[in-house]
């Protein structure tokens, strides 16, 4: 009886067959975005689910295509002046790298502007099609490479700007992007020797936004807005 129990415990503890590359320098992460509907909020929602530090810049007035950026995203700050382009510029230059998630190529509108601005400012930028079968692997491997290439030898957090189309431009992209990012973060937590959680100066886990706020995010197409939105 005892032998059978021990065998069951051994079977349950079998190592996963997934073999993943590991960075040489495990680092905490911070996820930022402009708080727009769609990919921006998917990045924040996925980070919130893992208590990863979040932040970023919103347009002046916290503008978004559904009105204003939800109060649940209280770590986001308003740009002192300017609109969507100013928000984009500040998030790019305040980040170590930018991840762009899209349904189709080529990039257009504000998404294309984000990629162009990152290139002009020497910031790494990765564009991933959510429909790619290996989208999760692409993102995971790129993030691992950043842990070694961004300020090599340092242990400070890496700031990742997550960007892409708004919800009305790619209906359903919030859920697709969030699902993909949750898979990436799960890989890090389970298999990569650590997780992406925000860590304070004393090495303690920091839960920056309660997970309950994930539920207030809407996937419904917003009402018409007369101002150009990106």
Task: Name what the model sees in each region.
Residues 222:
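Acidic, glycine/polar-enriched metal-coordinating patches/loops
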Residues 227-230:
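Non-Sec secretion/translocation targeting segments of pathogen effectors
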Residues 179-217:
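Charged phosphate-binding loop/patch that engages nucleotide di/tri-phosphates or the phosphate backbone
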Residues 1:
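Non-catalytic, low-structured ubiquitin/UBL-interacting segments
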Residues 11-12, 16-159, 166, 171-188:
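Acidic/glycine-enriched connector segments
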């Amino acid at each position: 009886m005892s032998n059978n129990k021990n065998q069951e415990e051994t079977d349950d503890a079998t190592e996963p067959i997934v073999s993943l590359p590991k960075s040489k320098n495990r680092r905490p992460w911070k996820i930022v975005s402009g708080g727009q509907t769609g990919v921006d909020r998917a990045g924040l929602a996925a980070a919130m689910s893992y208590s990863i530090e979040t932040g970023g810049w919103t347009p002046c007035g916290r503008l978004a295509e559904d009105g204003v950026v939800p109060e649940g995203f209280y770590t986001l700050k308003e740009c002192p002046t300017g609109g969507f382009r100013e928000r984009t510029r500040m998030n790019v230059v305040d980040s170590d790298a930018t991840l762009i998630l899209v349904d189709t190529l080529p990039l257009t509108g504000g998404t294309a502007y984000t990629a162009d601005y990152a290139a002009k400012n020497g910031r790494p930028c990765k564009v991933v099609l959510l429909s790619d079968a290996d989208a999760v692997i692409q993102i995971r491997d790129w993030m691992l490479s950043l842990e070694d290439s961004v300020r090599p030898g340092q242990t400070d957090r890496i700031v990742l700007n997550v960007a892409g189309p708004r919800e009305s431009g790619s209906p359903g992209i919030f859920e697709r992007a969030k699902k993909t990012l949750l898979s990436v973060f799960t890989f890090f937590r389970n298999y990569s020797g650590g997780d992406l959680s925000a860590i304070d100066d004393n090495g303690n886990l920091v839960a920056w936004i309660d997970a309950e706020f994930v539920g207030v995010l809407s996937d419904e197409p917003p009402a018409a807005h007369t101002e150009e939105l990106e």
